[in-house]
Amino acid sequence: MDVNLAPLRAWDDFFPGSDRFARPDFRDISKWNNRVVSNLLYYQTNYLVVAAMMISVVGFLSPFNMILGGIIVVLVFTGFVWAAHNKDILRRMKKQYPTAFVMVVMLASYFLISMFGGVMVFVFGITFPLLLMFIHASLRLRNLKNKLENKMEGIGLKKTPMGIILDALEQQEDSINKFADYISKARE
């Protein structure tokens, strides 16, 4: 299946005003996780543009440390995803505690980068855009178009770069299973 980049959402849709933002229910982790995954899929191109601008500014100020940090993060992330697919205990951890999995990757990257120097470049250049994405995805309420796009991604009608990343983190399987359960209940 072809991978398509999601369209760039309008600024008033991406950041519409305080009425479309709400604090997530921290007691219901699955609902919060669903909101984050849905928003990451729907606004992925906007997140990419914001991250690229921030990374470009930091990379312009300190290019060597930025490249070094990027290489280390990609290698650590790839290593953890590979290990999680080959080791059952890591696979269960990644599935049950996705936030902890991402935090372990970030901490491992931090320690490797601190051995080479340039920790602050990593923090501001790579981690800060990720933090902003997570905060926006957590607080932004979903609209009907967002939910429809996510269902199309979930059942395989569309494939996007963020969908591939979330599949690697095994964050879309649950939504596909829920959708399949819904269809089977609707048939009955």
Swiss-Prot record:
GO terms for biological process: cellular response to oxidative stress; glutathione metabolic process; intrinsic apoptotic signaling pathway in response to oxidative stress; L-glutamate import across plasma membrane; L-glutamate transmembrane transport; learning or memory; negative regulation of L-glutamate import across plasma membrane; negative regulation of mitochondrial membrane potential. The modification N-acetylmethionine is found at M1. Residues 103-117 are annotated as: Required for homodimer formation and heterodimer formation with ARL6IP1. GO terms for molecular function: transmembrane transporter binding. Induction: By methyl-beta-cyclodextrin. One of its GO terms (cellular component) is plasma membrane. Belongs to the PRA1 family. Regulates intracellular concentrations of taurine and glutamate. Negatively modulates SLC1A1/EAAC1 glutamate transport activity by decreasing its affinity for glutamate in a PKC activity-dependent manner. Plays a role in the retention of SLC1A1/EAAC1 in the endoplasmic reticulum. This is PRA1 family protein 3.
